[in-house]
Amino acid sequence: MPVIGTFCVSVDKDVCVNAQSPGKCATCVEVCPYGVYEIDAQGQVHVNNYNTCVGCRICAEFCPANAIRINPAESEYLSRYPWTFGQIEEIHHKSLTGGYLLRGFGTAGPLPHFDGIVVVPSQLASESPRDKYREECQMEVVIGEDTAEEPITLRYPILFPAMSYGALSREAKLALAIGAAKTGIATNTGEGGVVPEEPYYANGYADPERKEQKWAPGGYLVIQWSTGRWGVSADYVNAGDAVEIKIGQGAKPGMGGHLLGAKVTEEIAAVRGIPVGSDALSPCRYYDVLSFEDMKKMVAFLRDVTDYKKPILMKLGPSRPYDDVRMAAEAGVDAISIDGICGGTGASPDVVTQGVGIPTIACIPPAVRALKDLGLHRKVKLIALGGIRNGLDAFKALAM
Protein backbone atom coordinates (compact mmCIF):
# COMPACT_ATOMS: atom_id res chain seq x y z
CA MET A 1 0.00 0.00 0.00
CA PRO A 2 2.04 3.00 -1.20
CA VAL A 3 1.90 6.13 0.91
CA ILE A 4 2.67 9.31 -1.03
CA GLY A 5 0.04 11.90 -0.14
CA THR A 6 -1.87 12.63 3.02
CA PHE A 7 -4.04 9.51 2.68
CA CYS A 8 -3.45 5.82 1.99
CA VAL A 9 -5.74 4.12 -0.54
CA SER A 10 -5.98 0.33 -0.40
CA VAL A 11 -8.18 -2.03 -2.42
CA ASP A 12 -8.86 -5.58 -1.25
CA LYS A 13 -8.42 -7.55 -4.48
CA ASP A 14 -9.99 -10.64 -2.93
CA VAL A 15 -13.41 -8.97 -2.77
CA CYS A 16 -13.15 -6.24 -5.43
CA VAL A 17 -15.65 -6.96 -8.23
CA ASN A 18 -13.34 -5.47 -10.87
CA ALA A 19 -10.37 -7.53 -9.74
CA GLN A 20 -12.42 -10.71 -10.13
CA SER A 21 -14.08 -9.65 -13.40
CA PRO A 22 -12.27 -6.79 -15.20
CA GLY A 23 -14.65 -4.36 -16.84
CA LYS A 24 -17.61 -5.43 -14.73
CA CYS A 25 -17.36 -2.60 -12.16
CA ALA A 26 -15.71 0.81 -12.22
CA THR A 27 -17.73 2.58 -9.55
CA CYS A 28 -14.68 4.09 -7.86
CA VAL A 29 -13.48 5.60 -11.14
CA GLU A 30 -16.92 7.08 -11.77
CA VAL A 31 -17.54 8.60 -8.34
CA CYS A 32 -14.06 9.88 -7.42
CA PRO A 33 -13.98 13.62 -8.25
CA TYR A 34 -10.20 13.85 -7.88
CA GLY A 35 -8.90 11.32 -10.42
CA VAL A 36 -7.39 8.93 -7.90
CA TYR A 37 -8.43 5.87 -9.95
CA GLU A 38 -8.07 4.96 -13.63
CA ILE A 39 -9.20 2.08 -15.83
CA ASP A 40 -6.82 0.53 -18.35
CA ALA A 41 -7.43 -0.98 -21.77
CA GLN A 42 -8.15 -4.40 -20.25
CA GLY A 43 -10.85 -2.92 -18.05
CA GLN A 44 -8.86 -3.24 -14.82
CA VAL A 45 -9.03 -0.45 -12.26
CA HIS A 46 -5.84 0.89 -10.65
CA VAL A 47 -5.00 3.60 -8.16
CA ASN A 48 -3.52 6.26 -10.43
CA ASN A 49 -2.61 9.17 -8.18
CA TYR A 50 -2.37 8.89 -4.40
CA ASN A 51 -1.41 12.55 -4.10
CA THR A 52 -4.83 13.79 -5.17
CA CYS A 53 -6.78 11.82 -2.54
CA VAL A 54 -8.34 14.19 -0.02
CA GLY A 55 -9.83 11.52 2.22
CA CYS A 56 -13.47 12.18 1.31
CA ARG A 57 -14.20 8.42 1.26
CA ILE A 58 -16.80 8.77 -1.49
CA CYS A 59 -15.27 5.80 -3.29
CA ALA A 60 -15.40 3.68 -0.15
CA GLU A 61 -19.03 4.63 0.47
CA PHE A 62 -20.14 3.70 -3.06
CA CYS A 63 -18.01 0.57 -3.51
CA PRO A 64 -20.54 -2.31 -3.89
CA ALA A 65 -18.09 -4.84 -2.42
CA ASN A 66 -16.82 -2.67 0.45
CA ALA A 67 -13.31 -3.32 -0.85
CA ILE A 68 -11.78 0.16 -0.45
CA ARG A 69 -10.11 1.53 2.66
CA ILE A 70 -8.98 5.14 3.07
CA ASN A 71 -6.75 5.83 6.06
CA PRO A 72 -4.70 8.87 7.05
CA ALA A 73 -1.02 8.65 6.17
CA GLU A 74 -0.47 10.92 9.17
CA SER A 75 -2.47 11.68 12.26
CA GLU A 76 -5.98 12.93 11.55
CA TYR A 77 -5.28 15.68 14.02
CA LEU A 78 -2.81 17.06 11.45
CA SER A 79 -4.81 16.35 8.30
CA ARG A 80 -8.52 16.72 9.13
CA TYR A 81 -8.85 18.11 12.65
CA PRO A 82 -11.41 18.91 14.00
CA TRP A 83 -13.55 17.05 11.44
CA THR A 84 -11.94 13.64 11.75
CA PHE A 85 -13.53 10.51 10.31
CA GLY A 86 -14.48 9.46 13.80
CA GLN A 87 -16.41 12.68 14.39
CA ILE A 88 -18.26 12.36 11.10
CA GLU A 89 -19.09 8.69 11.66
CA GLU A 90 -20.42 9.50 15.13
CA ILE A 91 -22.79 12.11 13.67
CA HIS A 92 -23.99 9.58 11.08
CA HIS A 93 -24.55 6.95 13.78
CA LYS A 94 -26.52 9.31 16.02
CA SER A 95 -28.70 10.52 13.14
CA LEU A 96 -29.49 6.96 12.03
CA THR A 97 -30.09 5.37 15.43
CA GLY A 98 -30.94 8.19 17.80
CA GLY A 99 -28.43 6.70 20.24
CA TYR A 100 -24.88 7.33 21.32
CA LEU A 101 -21.80 5.29 20.49
CA LEU A 102 -21.10 2.66 23.12
CA ARG A 103 -17.67 1.07 23.41
CA GLY A 104 -15.22 -0.57 25.76
CA PHE A 105 -11.63 0.08 26.85
CA GLY A 106 -10.64 3.61 27.90
CA THR A 107 -9.84 7.10 26.72
CA ALA A 108 -8.04 7.35 23.38
CA GLY A 109 -5.91 10.31 22.40
CA PRO A 110 -3.16 12.49 23.82
CA LEU A 111 -3.71 13.13 27.53
CA PRO A 112 -1.23 14.00 30.28
CA HIS A 113 0.21 10.65 31.32
CA PHE A 114 3.09 9.07 33.17
CA ASP A 115 5.24 9.31 30.02
CA GLY A 116 5.49 13.04 30.67
CA ILE A 117 7.07 12.51 34.10
CA VAL A 118 10.65 11.52 34.82
CA VAL A 119 12.23 10.24 38.03
CA VAL A 120 14.85 12.27 39.91
CA PRO A 121 17.49 9.76 41.07
CA SER A 122 19.25 9.69 44.42
CA GLN A 123 22.77 11.06 44.67
CA LEU A 124 24.87 13.15 47.10
CA ALA A 125 22.23 15.61 48.24
CA SER A 126 19.59 12.97 49.00
CA GLU A 127 19.37 9.57 50.63
CA SER A 128 21.88 7.16 49.14
CA PRO A 129 20.57 4.89 46.39
CA ARG A 130 20.15 1.19 47.05
CA ASP A 131 22.05 -1.51 45.22
CA LYS A 132 19.25 -3.60 43.73
CA TYR A 133 21.39 -6.74 43.61
CA ARG A 134 22.64 -6.63 47.20
CA GLU A 135 20.14 -4.71 49.33
CA GLU A 136 16.60 -5.73 50.15
CA CYS A 137 13.67 -3.42 49.64
CA GLN A 138 10.55 -3.65 51.77
CA MET A 139 7.55 -3.78 49.41
CA GLU A 140 4.74 -5.20 51.55
CA VAL A 141 1.60 -3.15 52.06
CA VAL A 142 -0.87 -3.88 54.87
CA ILE A 143 -4.50 -2.75 54.58
CA GLY A 144 -6.78 -2.65 57.61
CA GLU A 145 -4.19 -3.25 60.31
CA ASP A 146 -5.87 -0.81 62.74
CA THR A 147 -9.52 -1.66 62.14
CA ALA A 148 -9.91 -5.22 60.85
CA GLU A 149 -9.30 -8.45 62.73
CA GLU A 150 -7.96 -10.00 59.52
CA PRO A 151 -6.02 -7.31 57.62
CA ILE A 152 -4.60 -8.17 54.21
CA THR A 153 -0.87 -8.01 53.50
CA LEU A 154 0.02 -7.47 49.86
CA ARG A 155 3.44 -8.84 49.00
CA TYR A 156 3.91 -6.04 46.45
CA PRO A 157 2.31 -2.57 46.20
CA ILE A 158 0.15 -3.58 43.24
CA LEU A 159 -3.21 -5.30 42.77
CA PHE A 160 -5.70 -6.24 40.09
CA PRO A 161 -8.50 -3.63 39.97
CA ALA A 162 -12.21 -4.35 39.70
CA MET A 163 -13.31 -6.02 36.45
CA SER A 164 -16.71 -7.65 36.60
CA TYR A 165 -17.77 -11.16 35.69
CA GLY A 166 -19.49 -10.53 32.38
CA ALA A 167 -17.15 -7.82 31.24
CA LEU A 168 -14.53 -10.57 31.62
CA SER A 169 -15.12 -14.25 31.00
CA ARG A 170 -15.09 -16.88 33.73
CA GLU A 171 -11.70 -18.06 32.49
CA ALA A 172 -10.24 -14.56 32.67
CA LYS A 173 -11.57 -14.01 36.19
CA LEU A 174 -10.06 -17.26 37.42
CA ALA A 175 -6.76 -16.49 35.68
CA LEU A 176 -6.56 -13.22 37.61
CA ALA A 177 -7.34 -15.06 40.85
CA ILE A 178 -4.53 -17.55 40.21
CA GLY A 179 -2.18 -14.70 39.29
CA ALA A 180 -3.01 -12.95 42.56
CA ALA A 181 -2.35 -16.18 44.47
CA LYS A 182 1.01 -16.75 42.83
CA THR A 183 2.21 -13.21 43.52
CA GLY A 184 0.65 -12.63 46.92
CA ILE A 185 -1.48 -9.67 45.85
CA ALA A 186 -5.24 -9.05 45.56
CA THR A 187 -7.78 -9.36 42.79
CA ASN A 188 -11.26 -7.82 42.73
CA THR A 189 -14.65 -9.29 41.80
CA GLY A 190 -15.94 -6.11 40.20
CA GLU A 191 -19.64 -5.42 40.48
CA GLY A 192 -20.89 -8.53 38.68
CA GLY A 193 -20.96 -10.98 41.54
CA VAL A 194 -18.43 -13.65 42.37
CA VAL A 195 -17.39 -16.65 40.29
CA PRO A 196 -17.83 -19.70 42.60
CA GLU A 197 -14.16 -20.74 42.40
CA GLU A 198 -12.81 -17.21 42.72
CA PRO A 199 -12.48 -16.95 46.53
CA TYR A 200 -10.42 -20.09 47.08
CA TYR A 201 -8.45 -19.70 43.84
CA ALA A 202 -7.37 -16.23 44.99
CA ASN A 203 -6.22 -17.71 48.31
CA GLY A 204 -4.14 -20.27 46.42
CA TYR A 205 -6.38 -23.35 46.69
CA ALA A 206 -7.70 -25.46 43.82
CA ASP A 207 -10.58 -26.96 45.84
CA PRO A 208 -13.28 -25.41 48.05
CA GLU A 209 -12.21 -27.50 51.06
CA ARG A 210 -8.84 -25.71 50.96
CA LYS A 211 -6.95 -28.82 52.01
CA GLU A 212 -3.67 -28.08 50.30
CA GLN A 213 -2.44 -24.83 48.83
CA LYS A 214 -1.62 -25.15 45.13
CA TRP A 215 -0.49 -21.62 44.29
CA ALA A 216 1.82 -20.08 46.86
CA PRO A 217 2.08 -17.74 48.65
CA GLY A 218 -1.65 -17.15 48.20
CA GLY A 219 -3.43 -13.88 47.56
CA TYR A 220 -6.67 -12.12 48.41
CA LEU A 221 -10.09 -11.46 46.91
CA VAL A 222 -11.73 -8.05 47.26
CA ILE A 223 -15.53 -8.18 47.05
CA GLN A 224 -17.04 -5.14 45.37
CA TRP A 225 -20.22 -3.59 46.78
CA SER A 226 -21.76 -1.44 44.04
CA THR A 227 -24.89 0.53 43.30
CA GLY A 228 -26.39 -2.36 41.31
CA ARG A 229 -25.99 -4.84 44.20
CA TRP A 230 -25.67 -7.68 41.67
CA GLY A 231 -25.63 -11.03 43.44
CA VAL A 232 -25.30 -9.31 46.82
CA SER A 233 -26.01 -11.19 50.04
CA ALA A 234 -24.32 -11.62 53.40
CA ASP A 235 -22.59 -14.70 52.01
CA TYR A 236 -21.34 -12.71 49.02
CA VAL A 237 -19.91 -9.93 51.17
CA ASN A 238 -18.13 -12.47 53.37
CA ALA A 239 -16.85 -14.60 50.48
CA GLY A 240 -13.64 -12.61 50.11
CA ASP A 241 -10.95 -11.01 52.23
CA ALA A 242 -11.96 -7.34 51.92
CA VAL A 243 -14.92 -5.27 50.70
CA GLU A 244 -14.75 -2.34 48.28
CA ILE A 245 -17.51 0.27 48.04
CA LYS A 246 -17.69 1.45 44.44
CA ILE A 247 -18.55 5.14 44.08
CA GLY A 248 -17.23 5.68 40.55
CA GLN A 249 -14.70 4.63 37.94
CA GLY A 250 -12.27 6.36 35.63
CA ALA A 251 -13.71 5.49 32.23
CA LYS A 252 -17.22 6.73 33.06
CA PRO A 253 -17.29 8.94 36.17
CA GLY A 254 -20.75 10.02 37.19
CA MET A 255 -22.32 6.94 35.60
CA GLY A 256 -23.22 3.47 36.77
CA GLY A 257 -22.08 0.18 35.30
CA HIS A 258 -23.38 -1.23 32.01
CA LEU A 259 -23.09 -4.85 30.92
CA LEU A 260 -24.48 -5.40 27.43
CA GLY A 261 -27.26 -7.97 27.15
CA ALA A 262 -25.27 -9.89 24.55
CA LYS A 263 -22.82 -10.81 27.31
CA VAL A 264 -25.46 -11.93 29.83
CA THR A 265 -25.33 -15.71 29.45
CA GLU A 266 -27.25 -18.17 31.62
CA GLU A 267 -24.32 -18.47 34.03
CA ILE A 268 -23.84 -14.71 34.34
CA ALA A 269 -27.59 -14.15 34.65
CA ALA A 270 -27.69 -16.64 37.52
CA VAL A 271 -24.87 -14.88 39.35
CA ARG A 272 -26.36 -11.41 38.84
CA GLY A 273 -29.97 -12.44 39.36
CA ILE A 274 -31.27 -10.97 36.09
CA PRO A 275 -32.90 -12.41 32.92
CA VAL A 276 -30.66 -13.92 30.25
CA GLY A 277 -29.82 -11.45 27.47
CA SER A 278 -30.92 -8.31 29.33
CA ASP A 279 -28.68 -5.29 29.80
CA ALA A 280 -27.40 -4.93 33.36
CA LEU A 281 -27.51 -1.24 34.26
CA SER A 282 -26.28 -0.02 37.64
CA PRO A 283 -27.52 3.30 39.03
CA CYS A 284 -25.12 6.23 38.98
CA ARG A 285 -25.32 6.53 42.79
CA TYR A 286 -26.56 4.76 45.91
CA TYR A 287 -30.22 5.63 46.38
CA ASP A 288 -29.94 4.85 50.08
CA VAL A 289 -27.03 7.27 50.56
CA LEU A 290 -28.36 10.83 50.65
CA SER A 291 -25.77 12.45 52.90
CA PHE A 292 -22.28 12.08 54.28
CA GLU A 293 -23.77 10.56 57.43
CA ASP A 294 -25.43 7.90 55.27
CA MET A 295 -22.05 7.08 53.75
CA LYS A 296 -20.53 6.63 57.20
CA LYS A 297 -23.45 4.35 58.09
CA MET A 298 -22.77 2.24 54.99
CA VAL A 299 -19.14 1.75 56.03
CA ALA A 300 -20.26 0.84 59.55
CA PHE A 301 -22.91 -1.51 58.14
CA LEU A 302 -20.35 -3.41 56.07
CA ARG A 303 -18.03 -3.69 59.06
CA ASP A 304 -20.91 -5.13 61.04
CA VAL A 305 -21.89 -7.61 58.28
CA THR A 306 -18.29 -8.83 58.04
CA ASP A 307 -18.04 -9.07 61.85
CA TYR A 308 -15.27 -6.44 61.86
CA LYS A 309 -12.89 -8.96 60.32
CA LYS A 310 -12.33 -7.52 56.85
CA PRO A 311 -10.84 -4.23 55.61
CA ILE A 312 -13.22 -1.82 53.89
CA LEU A 313 -12.05 0.00 50.75
CA MET A 314 -13.68 2.69 48.61
CA LYS A 315 -13.25 3.28 44.87
CA LEU A 316 -13.60 6.79 43.45
CA GLY A 317 -13.73 8.14 39.92
CA PRO A 318 -11.78 11.22 38.73
CA SER A 319 -13.81 14.18 39.96
CA ARG A 320 -12.52 16.37 42.79
CA PRO A 321 -9.69 14.28 44.24
CA TYR A 322 -8.91 16.39 47.29
CA ASP A 323 -12.49 16.73 48.54
CA ASP A 324 -13.57 13.23 47.53
CA VAL A 325 -10.61 11.50 49.17
CA ARG A 326 -11.03 13.61 52.29
CA MET A 327 -14.70 12.59 52.61
CA ALA A 328 -13.91 8.93 51.95
CA ALA A 329 -11.22 8.93 54.62
CA GLU A 330 -13.51 10.65 57.11
CA ALA A 331 -16.15 7.99 56.40
CA GLY A 332 -13.79 5.49 58.01
CA VAL A 333 -12.47 3.30 55.19
CA ASP A 334 -9.09 1.57 55.29
CA ALA A 335 -8.00 2.26 51.71
CA ILE A 336 -9.12 4.53 48.88
CA SER A 337 -8.76 3.76 45.17
CA ILE A 338 -8.86 6.71 42.80
CA ASP A 339 -9.32 5.82 39.14
CA GLY A 340 -8.15 8.33 36.52
CA ILE A 341 -9.65 9.03 33.11
CA CYS A 342 -7.29 6.51 31.48
CA GLY A 343 -9.02 3.64 33.28
CA GLY A 344 -10.81 0.96 31.29
CA THR A 345 -14.38 -0.28 31.03
CA GLY A 346 -16.42 -2.99 29.35
CA ALA A 347 -19.01 -0.56 27.98
CA SER A 348 -19.45 3.20 28.19
CA PRO A 349 -20.75 6.06 26.03
CA ASP A 350 -17.81 7.20 23.92
CA VAL A 351 -18.54 10.85 24.68
CA VAL A 352 -18.16 10.21 28.43
CA THR A 353 -15.04 8.06 28.12
CA GLN A 354 -13.38 10.67 25.92
CA GLY A 355 -14.53 13.87 27.57
CA VAL A 356 -15.28 13.40 31.27
CA GLY A 357 -12.81 13.11 34.15
CA ILE A 358 -9.22 14.09 34.83
CA PRO A 359 -5.93 12.24 34.19
CA THR A 360 -4.58 9.82 36.76
CA ILE A 361 -1.44 11.89 37.31
CA ALA A 362 -3.65 14.86 38.24
CA CYS A 363 -5.56 12.76 40.80
CA ILE A 364 -2.63 11.53 42.87
CA PRO A 365 -1.08 14.72 44.37
CA PRO A 366 -4.35 16.24 45.70
CA ALA A 367 -5.41 12.83 47.02
CA VAL A 368 -2.14 12.49 48.94
CA ARG A 369 -2.50 16.03 50.24
CA ALA A 370 -6.02 15.29 51.52
CA LEU A 371 -4.77 12.35 53.58
CA LYS A 372 -1.84 14.36 54.92
CA ASP A 373 -4.11 17.24 55.93
CA LEU A 374 -6.19 14.76 57.93
CA GLY A 375 -3.11 13.14 59.43
CA LEU A 376 -4.16 9.81 57.91
CA HIS A 377 -1.55 9.30 55.18
CA ARG A 378 0.17 6.58 57.23
CA LYS A 379 -3.09 4.88 58.16
CA VAL A 380 -5.39 5.05 55.11
CA LYS A 381 -3.82 3.52 52.02
CA LEU A 382 -4.14 5.27 48.65
CA ILE A 383 -4.43 3.14 45.50
CA ALA A 384 -3.87 4.78 42.10
CA LEU A 385 -5.68 3.27 39.10
CA GLY A 386 -6.10 4.10 35.44
CA GLY A 387 -3.57 3.69 32.65
CA ILE A 388 -0.74 2.21 34.71
CA ARG A 389 0.88 -0.05 32.11
CA ASN A 390 4.16 -1.25 33.57
CA GLY A 391 6.60 -1.11 36.46
CA LEU A 392 7.89 2.34 35.56
CA ASP A 393 4.37 3.81 35.61
CA ALA A 394 3.78 2.15 38.99
CA PHE A 395 7.07 3.53 40.33
CA LYS A 396 6.16 7.05 39.21
CA ALA A 397 2.73 6.75 40.84
CA LEU A 398 4.35 5.65 44.10
CA ALA A 399 6.85 8.51 43.91
CA MET A 400 4.07 11.06 43.51
Feature names for model-found ranges:
Residues 13, 19-28, 56-59, 376-377:
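Cysteine-cluster motifs in flexible loop/terminal segments that predominantly coordinate metals
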Residues 44-47, 192, 196-201, 252-256, ...:
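Glycine-rich, proline-tolerant flexible connector loops at the mouths of alpha/beta enzymes
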Residues 23-46, 58-76:
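Iron-sulfur cluster-binding cysteine motifs and their immediate structural context
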Residues 231, 239, 244, 249-285, ...:
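Hydrophobic, small-residue-rich alpha-helical packing segments that form membrane-like cores
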Residues 61, 283-400:
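Glycine-rich phosphate/ribose-binding loops and adjacent secondary-structure elements
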Residues 1-3, 65-158, 162-254, 260-261:
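Conserved, well-structured core domains of diverse proteins
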Residues 2-15, 34-36, 42-45:
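N-terminal cysteine/histidine-rich coordination modules
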